[in-house]
C-alpha cells in the first residue's frame, strides 16, 4: 500500500535504514514496542479508573482499493490527511494531558529530527491552554525510559534553531527528565511521575 503525506511526498518507512538490536527480554519488556507498552498501560489506567488516555488515530485518505474477491478489499494507496500532532491525549485528575512517545537506538543523545515543527507548535498550544504536555523517550539499548516536560523539548528545539546542537544529550534528559519505572501492571507507570512533577 502506498501512503503519501499531504504535500504528495511518498511515505516509505522501509527506506529508513535501521539495525535490529538484540533486545533484552526483561520482566517489563518481553520484546514489546514502546507504543504497545503504552497502549497496555493506558488500558490498565482506564480499566482501573485511574486516567482516560488514548492513542490518537492517524487520519488516512484512501485513494486506491483493489477487490481481489467479493469479500476482500486491499488498500493499495492512501494519503495522510493532515500532519499528525502527538501520539496520545486524555484526562488525568481533571487536567488535559498530551504526549508524544519516541524511541532511539542512540547511546548518548536523542536527535531532534525525530520531532516535526507542527508537533512542537502543538505542544506549545497545549501549554498555553494550561494543559500538560510531555514526551516519553526510550533509550532502547539501555531499556531506559524518561518523561520530559514539553517546555524542555521546546527549549532544546529553540537552541537547535539558533545554531545549537541538533540533539538532546542523555545527560540533559537525565537532568531535566524523570526516569520511569517499568513493571507488569502497569507496564510503564508514567502516572506516578505525573503525580510528582505536576500534582505535588
Swiss-Prot record:
Co-factor remark: Binds 1 Mg(2+) ion per subunit.
Reactions the enzyme catalyzes: Endonucleolytic cleavage at a junction such as a reciprocal single-stranded crossover between two homologous DNA duplexes (Holliday junction)
Cell compartment(s), UniProt: Cytoplasm
Gene that produces this protein: recU
Enzyme Commission numbers on file: 3.1.21.10
Cross-referenced InterPro entries: Resolv_RecU, Restrct_endonuc-II-like, tRNA_endonuc-like_dom_sf
GO molecular function (one): nucleic acid binding
Family: Belongs to the RecU family.
Lineage: Bacteria, Bacillati, Bacillota, Bacilli, Bacillales
Name listed for the protein in its UniProt record: Holliday junction resolvase RecU
Record region (Disordered): 1-25
Residues that, per the record, bind Mg(2+): 85, 87, 100, 119
Site (Transition state stabilizer): 102
Source organism of this protein record: Bacillus cereus (strain AH187)
Free-text function comment from the UniProt entry: Endonuclease that resolves Holliday junction intermediates in genetic recombination. Cleaves mobile four-strand junctions by introducing symmetrical nicks in paired strands. Promotes annealing of linear ssDNA with homologous dsDNA. Required for DNA repair, homologous recombination and chromosome segregation.
Keywords from the UniProt entry: Cytoplasm, DNA damage, DNA recombination, DNA repair, Endonuclease, Hydrolase, Magnesium, Metal-binding, Nuclease
Listed GO CC annotations: cytoplasm
Tagged with keyword Nuclease: yes
Cofactor: Mg(2+)
Biological process per Gene Ontology, one example term: chromosome segregation
Amino acid at each position: 500500500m502506498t501512503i503519501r503525506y499531504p504535500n504528495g511526498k511518498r511515505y516509505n518507512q522501509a527506506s529508513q535504514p535501521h539495525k535490529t538490536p538484540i533486545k533484552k527480554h526483561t520482566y517489563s519488556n518481553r520484546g514489546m514496542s514502546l507504543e504497545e507498552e503504552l497502549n497496555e498501560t493506558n488500558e490498565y489506567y482506564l480499566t482501573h479508573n485511574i486516567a482516560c488516555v488514548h492513542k490518537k488515530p492517524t487520519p488516512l485518505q484512501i485513494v486506491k482499493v483493489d477487490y481481489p474477491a467479493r469479500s476482500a478489499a486491499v488498500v493499495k494507496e492512501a494519503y495522510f490527511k493532515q500532519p499528525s500532532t502527538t501520539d496520545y491525549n486524555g484526562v488525568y485528575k481533571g487536567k488535559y494531558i498530551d504526549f508524544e512517545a519516541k524511541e532511539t537506538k542512540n547511546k548518548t543523545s536523542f536527535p531532534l529530527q525525530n520531532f516535526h515543527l507542527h508537533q512542537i507548535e502543538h505542544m506549545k498550544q497545549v501549554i498555553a491552554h494550561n494543559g500538560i504536555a510531555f514526551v516519553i523517550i526510550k533509550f532502547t539499548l539501555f531499556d531506559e525510559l524518561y518523561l520530559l516536560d514539553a517546555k524542555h523539548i521546546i527549549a532544546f528545539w529553540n537552541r537547535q534553531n539558533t545554531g545549537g546542537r541538533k540533539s538532546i544529550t542523555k545527560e540533559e534528559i537525565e537532568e531535566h527528565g524523570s526516569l520511569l519505572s517499568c513493571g507488569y501492571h502497569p507496564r510503564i507507570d508514567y502516572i506516578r511521575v505525573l503525580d510528582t512533577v505536576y500534582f505535588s
